Design a protein with these regions (language model features):
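Extended beta-strand/beta-hairpin segments
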Residues: 1-41, 52-121
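Alpha-helical metal-binding/catalytic segments enriched in His/Glu/Asp
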Residues: 46-47
């Protein structure tokens, strides 16, 4: 189970109380993180952790530098995965299927939300 408490003190401003440090949210990105940017962060983080899990399980890599760039606009997430140059990708489809199967954040989205995940060249 996951739980949190949110406290708002003025329009377009809130703080979370949950696990770890409080998260301060705003209504506009120019002021800081917003609820939608947190969804974007959650998705990209989940994909990153799934990738780390994949390479730990199938290639024995316990430490792995991964970067995932993610953007969201009008029902469409685009994620680009950047992996270390020396990393061996035997089957890109298998890698992406693993992420699709195990990313619990992605599974929360409605069916009409598009999530494009691809490896950067």
């Amino acid at each position: 189970m996951y739980q949190t408490t949110i406290k708002g003190d003025k329009p377009y401003h809130s703080f979370s109380e949950g696990y770890g440090a409080p998260v301060e949210l705003f209504g506009y990105t120019e002021d800081g993180e917003t609820p939608m940017s947190l969804v974007n962060i959650a998705l990209a983080s989940c994909v990153t952790m799934c990738l780390q899990s994949y390479f730990a399980k199938f290639q024995g890599k316990e430490e792995l530098a991964i970067r995932v760039d993610s953007s969201y606009e009008e029902g469409h997430f685009k994620l680009k995965i950047h992996l270390h140059e020396n990393l061996v990708i035997e089957n890109e489809d298998k890698l992406l299927a693993f992420v699709d199967e195990f990313c619990r954040v992605k599974k929360l989205f409605r069916e009409d939300i598009v999530v494009d995940i691809s490896l950067a060249p």
